[in-house]
Amino acid sequence: VLNMQWSGDGVYTMDEAEKDGLELSYAVPEEGSNLWFDGFCMMKNGISGDAKKKQAAQAFINYISRPDNVIRNMYYVGYTSVIAGGDSDLIFKYADWCYGAEEDEEEVSPYDLSYFFSGAKETKNKYVLEVPKSQASRQVSAQYPKQSVLKRSAVMQCFSEEANRRISRMWIRVRCF
């Protein structure tokens, strides 16, 4: 079975398939893939230049970006946040809770998330999950792709109407063969 979908939807699909006793994996073609991230933004000068609305928007972004609220949002929507937590380890601990191996798990492998949670070399080994070997190509790889996957991926761009038509035709051909 082949399906193209957002990584969060892929995780949801894998979770639902498990309920039926099926094990699906997540893969990114060697040729590359789209990179995407979800985050909040606001207009530089607020809404219609209104200082109070700008302050309200900033307060909302600050609130939703707090690590405790990031975790609530990730839990609810099933997607990884653009927020890594700053000085807080809460989001990494949540990733460990979601994907880390149980203490009695025998076949585990390290899954390095340092690129996401830290830029400092001195914390290189601090952000490594021990995951069940089966998880390395499943949910954790969909939520936190390895750096090798990120290097062969590109941020999506807006396409013209003609480019959208060509891309839609391409996907129809993929589905038909």
Describe each PLM feature range.
Residues 1-29:
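Ligand-binding pocket segment of bilobal, Venus flytrap-like solute-binding proteins
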Residues 43-140:
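Mature extracytoplasmic/periplasmic domains
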Residues 7-11, 31-34, 47-48, 68:
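Solvent-exposed loop/turn segments at secondary-structure junctions
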Residues 1, 8, 15, 62-70, ...:
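Sec-exported extracytoplasmic/periplasmic mature domains
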Residues 111-177:
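Conserved C-terminal helix/tail region of periplasmic/extracytoplasmic solute-binding proteins
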Residues 20-44:
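Periplasmic-binding protein-like
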Residues 7, 57-61, 168:
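Extracytoplasmic/secreted envelope proteins and their assembly/folding machinery
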Residues 3, 31-33, 49-57, 160, ...:
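Solvent-exposed, acidic/flexible segments
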